[in-house]
Regions:
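DNA-contacting surface of Y-family translesion DNA polymerases
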Residues: 54, 60-67, 71, 79, ...
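Aromatic (phenylalanine/tyrosine) cluster motif
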Residues: 7-8, 12, 17, 28-30
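Acidic, metal-coordinating catalytic segment for phosphate/diphosphate chemistry
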Residues: 73, 403-493
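Long, highly charged, low-complexity intrinsically disordered interaction regions
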Residues: 217-275
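Hydrophobic alpha-helical hairpins/lids featuring a short glycine-rich hinge
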Residues: 182, 188-236
């Protein structure tokens, strides 16, 4: 019993295999190696996912491995090829020269919403399934069978149905998905308190302390976690393991579903060099298109570009994007502190009763609240309108945001509804505030919006506006209602 470590050495053509359990050699054997035992080849990358056939160290250096089937782990020295686990014979091996020293991981549930539906209904196991709206909606999630037909997220449902007539469309069950996502996060938290949720179905983990806490290196702990989530929750997750958050997130996308991919710190610059720039966090369609117009399409080309050109097209993000292209990212894994609410308010220079003027002010405040939500990767589940009357009495009105959102236009719609019942010719106010609470990690892409292409267009417009605000400041674009009433900048709170 106990945790085993395996060691394999090629000593002048003699293969030596040792299994060490609790500090003692529990098994050993010798074999005479032919050419297959020391195959040529350099590979500092990964062969550690579902279909691994070999694992190799560059220039014959020792590599480290973990078996995803039996959890055996160890070191390989003087050998450049491994076709299966030395303990159980499984080909499902994660191997890399830096495997045991990397501590930052990104876990991503595979085709999350569709996977939950297939878990709950085994009859859907071999069927093409999407979660999304009706004929006028769009795809929120597509299973991997559906993706074989070219179906992808955000595709109009009618187009997906045309691509695959036998497609099964399931309406989203956001509350149910949220519960499943919570179970996955609970499993993550059992490994480390340093869990940073990105959405309902993905998170960063800092596993720096797992050696002391669990007597396992991060790679071993993550392989065990994959097995636990599959067994206890019933869905698969893909893992990216690296030296920082940016590389870990990129890695998790390389081997799906149920994959495990490693990008080492030493290999990162060379690995990224020929990858497209949109692989980097923060490189959206607009920025990517602008760089492409300058013949900058890969990370290597980005690093070779003049600094002034990058600043011209990327603004103040140029330095950050350049660092990411080199494989550098100093952001720590930061668990979301339990923020109870996010709000913004302003006191007027004169008492106001006009509805249009109040809505224009609410528009400005809503924009501030929305951007703070997005910066913190949070959704708000309830909206609160705050009004201070001329006699200093405070009036508050609240309403649920269903589904939760970070979108300014959806928050403003609810604010206008609440405000409509509180305005009149004799109702004067000296302060207006907008706040959201019932906060949760962002995710789900606003599933009800996915049932309405019009809402999707509004979301795309808001995303474009956010990019302009980030690059040029809050006054870059002013809505018509705010312009008509005079731009009002909220006080910070």
């Amino acid at each position: 019993g106990g945790v085993s470590r395996c060691f394999y050495l090629n000593l002048f053509g003699l293969g030596v295999f040792l299994r060490v359990t609790q500090g003692r050699i529990s098994h050993y054997c010798f074999s005479i190696l032919g050419n297959a035992g020391n195959d040529a080849g350099k590979n500092t990358g990964n062969n550690g996912g579902n279909n691994m056939s070999e694992a190799a160290g560059a220039d014959g250096r020792a590599i480290e491995f973990v078996c995803r089937a039996c959890l055996a782990s160890g070191y390989l020295g003087g050998i450049n090829k491994l076709t299966s686990c030395l303990q159980c014979g499984s080909p499902r091996i994660v191997a890399h020269e830096e495997l045991f020293s990397l501590t930052i991981a990104h876990l991503d549930c595979d085709a999350f919403y569709a996977s939950v539906e297939k878990r709950d209904n085994p009859d859907l196991h071999d069927k093409p399934v999407i979660v999304g709206g009706g004929s006028r909606g769009v795809v929120a999630a597509a299973c991997y069978i559906a993706r074989q037909y070219g179906i992808r997220s955000a595709m109009p449902s009618w187009q997906a149905k045309r691509a695959c007539p036998e497609l099964i469309i399931i309406k989203p069950r956001m509350a149910h998905y949220s519960a499943v996502g919570s179970a996955v996060r609970e499993a993550m938290s059992s490994l480390t308190p340093l869990v940073e949720p990105l959405s309902i179905d993905e998170a960063f983990l800092d596993l720096s302390g797992t050696n002391q806490l669990h007597r396992k290196c991060p790679a071993e702990a993550l392989v065990a976690l994959q097995q636990t989530i599959l067994k206890d929750v019933g869905i698969s997750v893909s893992v990216g393991l690296a030296a920082n958050k940016s590389l870990a997130k990129i890695a998790s996308d390389q081997d799906k579903p149920d994959g495990f991919y490693v990008i080492g710190a030493q290999e990162a610059p060379a690995w990224l060099a020929d990858k497209p720039v949109n692989i980097l966090f923060g490189m959206g369609k607009t920025s990517t298109a602008r760089l492409a117009a300058e013949n900058i399409q890969t990370c290597g080309q980005l690093l070779a570009a003049p600094e002034y050109l990058l600043k011209q097209h990327l603004g103040r993000d140029a330095g950050r994007i350049t660092a990411l292209a080199r494989g550098e990212d100093r952001r720590p894994v930061t668990p979301h502190r339990a923020a109870k609410s996010i709000s913004s308010e302003t006191t007027f220079s004169h008492d106001i009763s006009d509805k249009d003027e109040l809505i224009a002010i609410a528009d400005t405040l809503t924009l501030t609240v929305s951007r703070r939500l997005k910066q913190k990767d949070l959704y708000g589940g309830r909206i609160t309108l705050k009004l201070k009357q001329t006699d200093h009495r405070i009036l508050t009105r609240s309403a649920p945001l269903s589904p939760p959102t970070d979108k300014a236009h959806r928050i403003l719609d609810e604010v206008i509804t609440l405000l409509s019942g509180e305005v009149g010719p004799r109702k004067f106010y000296r302060l207006l505030g907008v706040g959201v609470d019932a906060l949760q990690p962002a995710g789900g892409a606003g599933l009800l919006d996915l049932m309405d292409e019009g809402a999707q267009k509004q979301d795309s417009l808001e995303q474009a506006l956010d990019q302009l605000y980030d690059k040029h400041g809050d006054a870059a674009i002013i809505s018509g209602r705010r312009f008509a009433q005079g731009y009002v900048k909220p006080t910070k709170k």
